[in-house]
């Protein structure tokens, strides 16, 4: 088997996870690796060693390999802070790329900028690259993109620009509530009940002001009525998504939404929207990420 040597390397480095792809000619994916060493667990001087552990076998000792990276790696607490583009703006601007200082002469690491919004205040890092990648594949798109995740983003796209966006901490809230509150004693770790999820979505959407009470009811139901742990977990997920969909109505009502995220999360959002009469379709997260970073790499080399 021939040894894999990358023409360039794409990296999506988030808060809790890092993914890297060895890219060959015509943007072909030669190899993929991932790590749970996210931004939140690393000091500034640890980013380069972590990256090298993942990609070293893809490097050619006779040349410099470009690494294009997006995500929280460019945050203030990351490898090196990158600037924010201000909405309305194109998702990616290579004039704002930041080069990280590296000790290994075989790599040159470029970090893409994030996007900020002044009123209401909001920020994104990583999602702008995925939005750019989606737009690259859908040049005439005008509409709404939703990126489910730890911090879900809803963005209005107009004429190739991010016009406005809104963030919901739904994923993080689910993690905290299911793992670090009293409710953890009533929920399963991985189980799922679709009917409970859908009922939770409807309740969360119709009565968002009752979310604090509905959350405690999960604990009470488990004690008083022996609520199944899988049902409790699924209801919790549905409640939180329902509250988010209530708050995001201005984005999805009357619009066809494109969901860009993991297959599991995107399917949950798709089902949640469907229950409420919304329309949506899924777009591959990996395709969006690689398309965005590939565009940045090409522009960098043509500049």
Question: Language model features by range: what are they?
Answer:
Residues 17, 254-272:
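Glycine-rich phosphate-binding loops at beta-strand->alpha-helix junctions
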Residues 239, 246, 281-303:
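Glycine-rich phosphate-binding/hydrolytic loop that grips phosphoryl groups
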Residues 58-124, 159:
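Short beta-strand-loop/turn "lid" adjacent to the catalytic site in phosphate-handling enzymes
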Residues 3, 8-46, 283:
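Short glycine-rich, Thr/Ser-proximal phosphate-binding strand/loop in the N-terminal lobe
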Residues 29-65, 74-77, 81, 183-187:
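N-terminal phosphate-binding loop and adjacent alpha-helix
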Residues 8-12, 66-68, 143-147, 258-259:
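Short glycine-aspartate micro-motif
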């Amino acid at each position: 088997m021939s040894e894999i040597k990358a023409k360039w390397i794409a990296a999506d480095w988030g808060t809790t996870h890092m993914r890297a792809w060895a890219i060959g000619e015509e943007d072909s994916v030669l190899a993929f690796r991932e790590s749970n060493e996210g931004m939140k667990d690393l000091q500034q001087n640890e980013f380069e060693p972590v990256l090298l552990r993942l990609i070293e076998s893809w490097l050619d000792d006779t040349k410099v390999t470009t690494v294009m990276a997006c995500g929280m790696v460019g945050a203030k607490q990351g490898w090196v802070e990158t600037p924010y583009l201000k909405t309305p703006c194109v998702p990616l601007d290579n004039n704002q790329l930041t080069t990280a200082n590296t000790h290994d002469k075989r790599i040159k690491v470029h970090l893409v900028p994030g996007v900020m919004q002044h009123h209401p205040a909001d920020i994104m890092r990583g999602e702008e690259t995925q939005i750019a990648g989606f737009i690259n594949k859908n040049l005439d798109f005008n509409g709404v993109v939703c990126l489910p995740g730890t911090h879900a983003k809803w963005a209005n796209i107009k004429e190739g620009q991010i016009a406005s966006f809104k963030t919901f901490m739904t994923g993080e809230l689910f993690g905290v509530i299911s793992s670090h509150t009293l409710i953890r004693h009533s929920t399963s770790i991985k189980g799922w009940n679709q009917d409970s999820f859908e009922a939770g979505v409807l309740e969360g959407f119709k009565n968002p002001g009752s979310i604090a009470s509905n959350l405690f009811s999960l604990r009470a139901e488990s004690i008083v009525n022996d609520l199944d742990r899988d049902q409790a977990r699924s209801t919790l997920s549905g409640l939180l998504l329902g509250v988010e969909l209530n708050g995001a109505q201005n984005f999805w009502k009357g619009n066809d939404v494109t969901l860009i995220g993991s297959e599991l999360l995107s399917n949950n959002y798709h089902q949640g929207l469907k229950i409420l009469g919304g329309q949506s379709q899924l777009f591959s997260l990996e395709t969006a990420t690689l398309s965005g970073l590939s565009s940045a790499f090409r522009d960098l080399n043509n500049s």
